[in-house]
């Protein structure tokens, strides 16, 4: 198996949003494929569940893979194939197994099986194994599990895993209507596509002995198996789409950079062998080995992901940062009228914001004061900054000082001017500037105040200081 070019496969079902766990599996498979010039990453869409499949989910899979850098134009990429297109081959193999005596027909109902076993949790008892039933209505095809055993799965991550045949029932491989079950279709497709490595989540480990038996029954050498550790939340519960934020698209829509997501997902269960954490995928590929993947559960820590993302944002040059922010600035995501947005103003403020945000969507709250007609109303910030004896007095004095036509409207002179006002009020600059910041930007936290005043302009600053004073006076009446 190791003499052949690596052929990995990623086989998602188009039945929902693209899960971060699936993203990690795809990346691990992609990394293996990239390690050899002839290595292949095969994308197979397992679309046999017609009732749940939707075309937009398939499109979403392709978009998500592309965002992760798994590009269908890359020579290492093969597919996408669709499992439904191989239905005839699945039936053909099922019939072959029957002819060879490796499978048999069974007409037992679920109720009959449970009645014989006396326990609904016990599996099939092999009742039809030697009855010699022919194909017919109501007769499913079961694989004849060999007596003896065990089946040994050599897992690259978990080591040697034994499955006693007494615990493996003669499992159904085709329904009574002839349609194959997933366990058979999956193996047939892997054989047909010459897959050498099956790298997937540990929830599939229980199916592996059945699939290995099928590989062997078809006269094929089983692939390299590797079952990845489960991904858990902060409560150490398996990530669930009903409870946790698990859709890759949700993270990207929030402003997590694809390269940061790739970096973080690659480290869920694997590490490069040293203390490095922030590193590009291209440097991870030659270091990646399945044997180095941890079998213990991997904690999806969004706080750590945010920290990773912040590092990647700060590493962007200013031009690229501006481009990456564009989706949040000029669309329905922006809270200001489109005509208010000034690209030159944003380019000027971008370096100040770039060092402060962890996800791109946060850019809006840092720069909205520049493009809104009035600053946002944040009552908590207002109450904190506009203390009696400070708020009104500081705003009045600041407005008077900022109205001086001889005051140069740049950050440094503005800071010096406000320091003078603060000293006259007997206040330190930090406490003195809070009312001005809230009056002008609406928030107690944000970009450097004096650069913000410079960009906003003299007339708009004066207008907002007056409006804040009027609000204070109205509240005191």
Swiss-Prot record:
PROSITE patterns: AA_TRNA_LIGASE_I (PS00178). ATP binds at residue 241. It comes from Thermobifida fusca (strain YX). A motif ('KMSKS' region) lies at residues 238-242. It is found in: Cytoplasm. One of its GO terms (molecular function) is ATP binding. Its main location: cytoplasm. It catalyses: tRNA(Glu) + L-glutamate + ATP = L-glutamyl-tRNA(Glu) + AMP + diphosphate. Belongs to the class-I aminoacyl-tRNA synthetase family. Glutamate--tRNA ligase type 1 subfamily. Zn(2+) binds at residues 106, 108, 128, 130. Keywords: Aminoacyl-tRNA synthetase, ATP-binding, Cytoplasm, Ligase, Metal-binding, Nucleotide-binding, Protein biosynthesis, Zinc. It is an enzyme of class 6 (ligase). Its EC number is 6.1.1.17. The lineage of its organism: Bacteria, Bacillati, Actinomycetota, Actinomycetes, Streptosporangiales. A motif ('HIGH' region) lies at residues 12-22. NCBIfam families: gltX_bact. This is Glutamate--tRNA ligase. GO terms for cellular component: cytosol.
